Swiss-Prot record:
Gene3D superfamilies (alphabetical): D-Amino Acid Oxidase, subunit A, domain 2, FAD/NAD(P)-binding domain
Activity regulation, per record: Pyrrole-2-carboxylate is a competitive inhibitor. N-(cyclopropyl)glycine (CPG) is a mechanism-based inhibitor and inactivates the enzyme by covalently modifying the flavin.
Modified positions (S-8alpha-FAD cysteine) in chain numbering: 316
Cofactor dependence: FAD
Full protein name: Monomeric sarcosine oxidase
Subunit structure: Monomer.
Organism expressing this protein natively: Bacillus sp. (strain B-0618)
Binding-site residues for FAD, renumbered to this chain: 6-36
Function recorded in the entry: Catalyzes the oxidative demethylation of sarcosine. Can also oxidize other secondary amino acids such as N-methyl-L-alanine.
Length: 390
């Protein structure tokens, strides 16, 4: 294999693999390097499914990228035999007047003229008999959003990238970088590789390796769990149009998925709890009592028909920035290095669009997308660029 490429992508997970596909599609000589063999269970993309929402409770600024990402997921599905997306619709609910997340979701839908249904508590319960909410709750249902099959997404992008000439170097950890104005070099245990441009998208490992690029941004990885629960298929199955959901209730934010093919309702608790090192994280579900108890607490109150036997659990990681917004930008000192980091537990849905952004930044130094919210020089991060530690 050649040791020089047009672009090297370090970290071939959600964002990196999508970028590799976009580059290879344009005939760019591309090398993707990953410490594992994607798709795998060591990062932030496994667990079968991810929700894609367009009306975005984390900030209406995300909506254009969400819509572009949806277009690209549809395009990917046409190119591959893998199942990529199912339009389940997504339900967002919470206490009326108390949930900032629900309120921002509604404002995002209004500002961008998205198709949605607005519902009150009784209407929610009648439309989805598996859900039990108080009368003082309200909701927004987005029929055109749904569920992505995350591992299939990465698998499809990898197959298509390799078919177009991209090289994927697996089980290879990058140990160091050497950056000059007109070239980049990565050092691995298997040798050195050079390129004109570099994309760094190492997920939780960004927190450990960006310092080698003279960047010490506060990125904190957290342990995150999901559980699959035996549930009443007549109420919670995708076959009867039970939606994906993202809810803000008094004890936190939860997200979940209908049962596909009898797998059980999948539920996660969106929290930044246990700080971890990605190399030493405990990947056993249930090792902490709250792994299951936090999920049970939600099911007991809001979806009792899905509070059955735990069929399986999974452990993955979030990597959080201080403001929970992404970092997608050129390196402040090296215009031939692109950084993608800190997706803070809500990035996967955007990975098709982010891949397009990263490829554009690598090839031209700019992008057609407005990514100002993701600036590496934004106030919430700027002080941290001067060797601040977590």
């Amino acid at each position: 294999m050649s040791t020089h490429f047009d672009v090297i992508v370090v970290g071939a997970g959600s964002m990196g693999m999508a970028a590799g596909y976009q580059l290879a599609k344009q005939g760019v000589k591309t090398l993707l390097v990953d410490a594992f063999d994607p798709p795998h269970t060591n990062g932030s993309h496994h667990g079968d499914t991810r929700i894609i929402r367009h009306a975005y409770g984390e900030g209406r600024e995300y909506v254009p990228l969400a819509l572009r990402s949806q277009e690209l997921w549809y395009e990917l599905e046409k190119e591959t035999h893998h199942k990529i997306f199912t339009k389940t619709g997504v339900l967002v609910f919470g206490p009326k007047g108390e949930s900032a997340f629900v309120a921002e979701t509604m404002e995002a839908a209004k500002e961008h003229s998205l198709t949605v249904d607005l519902l009150e508590g009784d209407e929610i319960n009648k439309r989805w008999p598996g859900i039990t909410v108080p009368e003082n709750y309200n909701a927004i249902f987005e029929p055109n959003s749904g569920v992505l099959f995350s591992e299939n997404c990465i698998r499809a992008y990898r197959e298509l990238a390799e078919a177009r000439g991209a090289k994927v170097l697996t089980h290879t950890r990058v140990e160091d970088f050497d950056i000059s104005p007109d070239s980049v070099k990565i050092e691995t245990a298997n040798g050195s590789y050079t390129a004109d441009k570099l994309i760094v998208s190492m997920g939780a490992w960004n927190s450990k390796l960006l310092s080698k690029l003279n960047l010490d941004i506060p990125l904190q990885p957290y342990r995150q769990v999901v559980g699959f629960f035996e549930s009443d298929e007549s109420k919670y199955s995708n076959d009867i149009d039970f939606p994906g959901f993202m809810v803000e209730v008094p004890n936190g934010i939860y997200y979940g998925f209908p049962s596909f093919g009898g797998c059980g309702l999948k539920l996660g608790y969106h929290t930044f709890g246990q700080k971890i090192d990605p190399d030493t994280i405990n990947r056993e579900f249930g090792v902490y009592p709250e792994d299951e108890s936090n999920l049970r607490a939600f099911l007991e109150e809001y979806m009792p028909g899905a509070n059955g036997e735990l069929k399986r659990g999974a452990v993955c990681m979030y990597t959080k920035t201080l403001d929970e917004h992404f970092i997608i930008d050129l390196h402040p000192e090296h215009s031939n290095v692109v950084i993608a980091a800190g997706f803070s537990g809500h990035g996967f849905k955007f990975s098709s669009g982010v891949g397009e952004v990263l490829s554009q930044l690598a090839l031209t130094g700019k992008t057609e997308h407005d990514i100002s919210i993701f600036s590496i020089n934004r106030p919430a991060l700027k002080e941290s660029l001067q060797k601040t530690t977590i």
